[in-house]
């Protein structure tokens, strides 16, 4: 009985060594592919290593898995970047989404941020064509995805707000515009100036139309929409008071 137990233990040790050697080969294959910029093959090999070595107690394997977790998001990032350079935006977004998700899963927060920022820039380029063609519905759909990826992309946000206003959804556009206008970081100063101009432009256009129709209740409703988004909106308060005065309802 003892002999059988010893044999079983010996087989277990041999099996563990063989498994480690197999993972070592996978690791070397992944590193070689990564260094040669074959990021698709590298990602596949690194993910295989993670799947097979995740529960290993071997210190070498744990080190390989840790490297793999850092490398997988980078692989997908590079694949997304390459696709973007070729104007293959669908593939670029697909790979960058994988990069961001893998980075979040493995705790690589800086890489997650980088992937989302690049994704937003791609959406910005992607939406530029329909925006310039005044196809605001298509542009808004694209820009909204980019804004979700990186809410700090103020240029993207401004274009999205414009799309909503052009589509007649003034309040939705105003929510975006006010988000930009509330930024106090100096690097967004130019964006804040632009968006305040847009708020005035679209507000004045709506008010002018309603004034031409002597629709004072409509003007008050516009002001109320603005105040619902930002209760401290001085422009909205002024518009409302003026409309009440013109209506002689005070």
Language-model segments: which ranges?
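Canonical tetratricopeptide repeat
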Residues: 62-64, 71, 78, 118, ...
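N-terminal leader/linker segments that initiate helical-solenoid repeat arrays
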Residues: 2, 18-97, 102-106
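Register position in tetratricopeptide repeats
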Residues: 35-36, 74, 78, 85, ...
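TPR alpha-solenoid repeat register
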Residues: 59, 68, 75, 108-109, ...
